[in-house]
Design a protein with these regions (language model features):
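A conserved regulatory-domain signal marking ACT and ACT-like small-molecule sensing domains
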Residues: 1-388
Length: 388
C-alpha cells in the first residue's frame, strides 16, 4: 500500500448528543458548521485575529457532524467545544446536560491518503498497528480520505507503532509514508507487547468479540435505510460556476473589510446541508477537512434536498450495519480492527471496494454494498449472539 499519514494541526473533542436533545442543541451545531457565526465583537476586525481550528481563509481544519439512528456525534476543534457547546450545556438542567457526553481527553487526527489496496485491507493496514499497541481509535472514511482519531496523550505511541509497521518518518515529523512491504525487506523490530495486550491480530479479534458479546453488542440494520457517499465540488469546479464573480483577496474585500467565510465556500451546498440538518435526518455524516471538498455520507432519500450540488455515485446503494457501543468506554481498543478483520476474512467482502467504517461517539457503522451487508450480518450475528 502506498500511503501518506499526517497529523492535522490542533486538538479535537468528541461530543455525543442523544437524539432527543438534537433539536435543543441544533443551534450550537450550526454555529460550528458556519464559523462566521462565532461572534467576538470588534475583535473580528483585528487583522491578527484568527479563530482556533480554522485555516487562513476561515475553513475548518477538520469537522465531522454525524446523525445516525443511534445518536448525533460531533468531532470539532477543542476550542469550539469549549466556547460554543459548553456554554449552552451549562444552561440546561443538570440531569439533561449529563446525558450529553463531551470527551475529557483531547484527540489528534491522522489524515490518511492511500492507494493500491482494497477498502477492507486499507482499514486493517491502518488500524491494526494501533490496536495491537493498545491505542483507542475512532475511524472515519470519507469520499477522499480516511481519518483516524487518537488520544493526544498517545502521540508518541502512535509514532512508534507506525514506524514499527514500516511507515517512514518524513522531514516533516508530522508525516509518515509507507511504500508497503517488499519481499525480503528488513522491517523495524517490533517491540514485544505490553502485559495484557494481544500479541497478534487473531488474539486481538478474539478479545474484541469477547468484549462485544459480554456487553451485549449486536449488529443490526435499519430497515429501508440506504446510503450514498458523495462530495461537494472541487474548488476548480466552483470557479467555473462562479466565473462572473470578482476575485477575492484573503485580506480585504471591495468594501474594505476582510472577506468572510462565505466568500470561499459553495454556499449552495451549505444551504442544502443546513436544510438537511434542520430536518433531523435519519442518517447524515458531513466531514470538512482543509485539503478536501466537503464529504457527505447520507440517507439516499436526502438527495433531492441537495439537487446538483453533489458529485459522486448517487445511484449507489450502501447499507450500514450498526454497533451500539454505548456500554463501552472511549478507551476501548481494537473495535474497528477487530470487526473489519473478521469481515475481510471472507473472500467476497475482502475484494469489495465499498467496505468503509464510520466511528461516532458511542457507536460504529460498517458500510457495505447491499449484497455484502447480507454476508457481513451472516458473519457477525453468530459471533455476537449469546447461546441460550
Amino acid at each position: 500500500m502506498n500511503a501518506q499519514v499526517s497529523f492535522l494541526d490542533g486538538t479535537y473533542t468528541l461530543i455525543h448528543i442523544p437524539l432527543n436533545l438534537y433539536s435543543t442543541l441544533l443551534q450550537p451545531i450550526l454555529r460550528v458548521l458556519l464559523p462566521q457565526s462565532q461572534s467576538q465583537g470588534n475583535l473580528r476586525d483585528s487583522p491578527e485575529y484568527e479563530l482556533q481550528g480554522l485555516t487562513s481563509d476561515g475553513q475548518h481544519g477538520f469537522l465531522n457532524i454525524s446523525i445516525t439512528p443511534l445518536e448525533c456525534s460531533v468531532v470539532c476543534h477543542s476550542s469550539w467545544a469549549q466556547n460554543v457547546f459548553e456554554p449552552v450545556l451549562k444552561t440546561l438542567p443538570r440531569d439533561v446536560a449529563k446525558s450529553v457526553s463531551v470527551s475529557k481527553d483531547s484527540y489528534m487526527i491522522l489524515s490518511v491518503i492511500s492507494a493500491g489496496l482494497d477498502a477492507g485491507g486499507r482499514v486493517m493496514e491502518l488500524t491494526s498497528p494501533l490496536a495491537l499497541a493498545g491505542i483507542p481509535i475512532f475511524f472515519i472514511t470519507t469520499y477522499y480520505s480516511d481519518f483516524i482519531l487518537v488520544p493526544t496523550k498517545e502521540r508518541d505511541n502512535v509514532a512508534k507503532s507506525l514506524l514499527a509497521k514500516g511507515f517512514e518518518l518524513c522531514e516533516n515529523e508530522s508525516n509518515y509514508v509507507t511504500q508497503g512491504y517488499k519481499k525480503g525487506a528488513t522491517q523495524p523490530p517490533v517491540t514485544p507487547p505490553h502485559e495484557g495486550l494481544p500479541s497478534n491480530v487473531s488474539e486481538m479479534q478474539k478479545n474484541t468479540f469477547g468484549l462485544l458479546k459480554k456487553r451485549h453488542v449486536t449488529p443490526h440494520i435499519e430497515e429501508g435505510l440506504v446510503l450514498v457517499q458523495c462530495s461537494g465540488r472541487e474548488a476548480s469546479q466552483l470557479a467555473s460556476f462562479n466565473h462572473q464573480r470578482p476575485s477575492i483577496s484573503r485580506h480585504t474585500t471591495g468594501n474594505g473589510r476582510r472577506p468572510s467565510w462565505a466568500d470561499n465556500v459553495d454556499t449552495k451546498l451549505y444551504t442544502c446541508i443546513i436544510s438537511a440538518l434542520v430536518s433531523q435526518p435519519r442518517f447524515m455524516s458531513v466531514t470538512l477537512a482543509q485539503d478536501d471538498p466537503p464529504s457527505l455520507l447520507l440517507d439516499k432519500n436526502l438527495l433531492d434536498v441537495f439537487g446538483d450540488s453533489l458529485v459522486g455515485d448517487t445511484e449507489g446503494c450502501l447499507i450500514p450495519i450498526f454497533l451500539n457501543l454505548e456500554s463501552l468506554s472511549l478507551e476501548a481498543t481494537g473495535i474497528v480492527c477487530g470487526v473489519a478483520g473478521i469481515l475481510v476474512q471472507d473472500p467476497q467482502i475482502a475484494e469489495s471496494s465499498e467496505l468503509s467504517y464510520l466511528s461516532t461517539a458511542q457507536a460504529g457503522a460498517v458500510i457495505l454494498s447491499d449484497e455484502q451487508s447480507v454476508r457481513a450480518m451472516g458473519i457477525l450475528e453468530p459471533l455476537l449472539t449469546k447461546e441460550p
